[in-house]
Amino acid sequence: MKKVVVGLSGGVDSSTAAAILHHQGYEVIGLTLWLMKGKGQCCSEGMIDAADLCEQLGVPHQIVDIRDLFQTHIVDYLVTGYSAGITPLPCSQCNKTVKFGPMVQYAREELGCDRIATGHYARISYDEATGRYQLLRAIDRNKDQSYFLYDLSQDLLAATIFPLGELEKTDTRRIATEYGLKTADKPESQDLCLVESNGSMRAFLDKYLAPKSGDIVDTTGKILGQHDGVHHYTIGQRKGLGIAAAEPLYVIELDAENNKVVVGDRTKVTQPECTVNRVNWVSIAEPSTPIHAEVQIRYRSTPTPVTVIPLENSRVRLVFDEPQFSITPGQAAVWYDGEKVLGGGIIEQFS
């Protein structure tokens, strides 16, 4: 019997993924990662629901404590980034370094198993011509999570199964109901786990970063107002600035060194290109010449035509066919060829 370790958060997606594999004849081992320190309500409730699911399916359930790893790679990563004036994207970092990597390692070393599965909405295929595993969008485009998975290595993709990749979300809930899963009607998480457990990103950051008042200025240096910390702002932000102006103003720069928030009109926050670092080439090997693709600079942004120009040291330059609004340092840029994820990386700060 084929053995697979299924990552269980206690939600309907991971529960259904486990149930599907169980009914397909896999020997399923449920695995829940204990992520957050303190009274992280989402984790404790998720652990209970995951344990209940495994009892219902008659499969073993294990909990692995990786709170220190989560603290280092996610909490500290976020706090350091925001304090430096960038807006980090924790999800892709978490998937690679906290979830998939440790899950595969634990499965291989502790459970003698070389396959894992999760409830993510994405697909994986193998290209025999290139010898590479390809990451593809999910069938349900509205639930597609490939943007957050671009940083998975070939080794991790080879070890992973996405049972929900071919399903619509409505199908997932229908299957969960048919299997009689207790999580079938469980509401979806609406935000980052850290945000849900703290109430807001601002509340989370306030636990680690003290208020630090400074000036909100325009591009000439004129003081327009005050702020209580650059970490409370993000590029492209318009609301919540607390300043009056004849025309709409947006955050165009976060000058953490001088503790200033710089604002300007919409043209000042629209860019024709950007540089991306920590690039991971997924479905294709790194090209030696520029390629044309479609890029997403945010999770829900519309894919836009782009020229991807390879640079040294795992970096690329993205030149957009049309200038893009609110390109945010710290967020991921992920480029596609149709449904295929070609590569992605982290947007650098503008010099």
From Swiss-Prot:
Subcellular location: Cytoplasm
Binding site for ATP: G7, L8, S9, G10, G11, V12, D13, S14, L33, G119
Keyword tRNA processing attached: yes
Keywords: ATP-binding, Cytoplasm, Disulfide bond, Nucleotide-binding, RNA-binding, Transferase, tRNA processing, tRNA-binding
EC annotation from Swiss-Prot or TrEMBL: 2.8.1.13
One MF term in the entry's GO annotations: tRNA-uridine 2-sulfurtransferase activity
Reaction catalysed by this enzyme: S-sulfanyl-L-cysteinyl-[protein] + uridine(34) in tRNA + AH2 + ATP = 2-thiouridine(34) in tRNA + L-cysteinyl-[protein] + A + AMP + diphosphate + H(+)
Key word tRNA processing present: yes
Cysteine disulfide links: C94-C193
NCBIfam families: PRK00143.1, trmU
Family annotation (PANTHER family): MITOCHONDRIAL TRNA-SPECIFIC 2-THIOURIDYLASE 1, TRNA 5-METHYLAMINOMETHYL-2-THIOURIDYLATE -METHYLTRANSFERASE
Reported function: Catalyzes the 2-thiolation of uridine at the wobble position (U34) of tRNA, leading to the formation of s(2)U34.
Family the UniProt entry places it in: Belongs to the MnmA/TRMU family.
Name the record gives this protein: tRNA-specific 2-thiouridylase MnmA
